């Protein structure tokens, strides 16, 4: 007869159970937006001197979040008294030049005494005196250059300039 059928060389078995793979789940679900708190502050101040001759104006603002931190400050100093003190009034005076000459009249009268025939002429002014002109000293004031300072701390790095 017939020979029994030979068993196959490879035997198949039922599929094994699927293993469970897990990754570390995020702390924040991606379906819900993150509402991170932010802390802010701002302040402004103007300090004036007596008679409003000078003032210092300051303004500052900060914003802090878990991810970043920002700080801005603006300080301005003004002193209009310096501007007026530097520009002193200038007084200039020059005496007028003498242009008229005076000559005394000649004596023509005769006396019993000897006759005077000489004429007298007053000296003519040759030079006029002019006072020196006061000159201003050239002092120029300009605004202070803008200064910016920035700091950043995050992602393992800190920068400042």
Curated annotation (Swiss-Prot):
- Respond yes or no to whether keyword Glycosyltransferase is given for this record: no
Q: Does the keyword Repeat apply?
A: yes
From the UniProt record, list the sequence repeat ranges. Answer: 6-9, 14-17, 35-38, 87-90, 103-106, 112-115, 121-124, 130-133, 143-146
Q: Name one GO molecular function term.
A: structural constituent of cuticle
* InterPro entries linked: Cuticle_C1
Q: Which Pfam families match?
A: Cuticle_3
Instruction: Write out the entry's keywords from A to Z.
Output: Cuticle, Repeat
| Primary role | Component of the cuticle of the pupa of Tenebrio molitor.
Entry text on domains? The tetrapeptide (A-A-P-[AV]) repeats found throughout the protein are also present in many proteins constituting the protective envelope of other species.
Q: What is this protein called?
A: Pupal cuticle protein C1B
Organism this protein belongs to: Tenebrio molitor (Yellow mealworm beetle)
